[in-house]
């Protein structure tokens, strides 16, 4: 920690301002701006997020209280709440979306060699969604049930570093599986998801990338076994099978070989059946990689706090 400088100023040292400036120039964000630049808006909202502010008035009050200390972070003067409200409403959101992608690319490089607990050469991602409840009185456009409002946040979480590779916000009634088609697939990567994403046509698209998917098999899965590998019962593996889909319509969507791995969780006693197109990874590593999917649940808890 550096004496004499605020924590906020030291955190902002890691923000690549040149990248932010490029995003602002790309969309003309600072044209005809009198007082609150895009970067000052970004700093004010970072301060609000990091300190848990709950309203524009709360942000304004706290910034006025600590304003002089934030001068060296780049925030020359605390913005009035009306100015900040106008900026949040009218500024081009693509400035901050593009900058977010630049930060994600930077984080990806930093965590490229982060251990996963399994031997894996490529990237690994967890795909899931969560519904964020909204007050219908304040957000009447977010209605999705008779008395409830909300949005659904679909997230692809990089398991090396546990940060989001992308986030897509949709109406709450959009089904999870529709987002599989939005994936820009990375060759050699692993995509881990729960059984709500089972779509064999999309799985075949992942297989042809070529990339890997890992999910829980649905209970009514019709599977034709062709080969069984020895199962390591000491590590909770009940069976390790390769085969094809038995149901004709499903096999038409996914005609290639699949692998089915049975696992008993020693901590909870639960029995799980995994489905993947990876036929070489040890079965115990398949189970361990699926356990890492829990990181996205922790990420959602953090977001909702």
Place the predicted regions along the sequence by residue.
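Major-groove recognition helix of helix-turn-helix-like DNA-binding domains
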Residues: 73-91
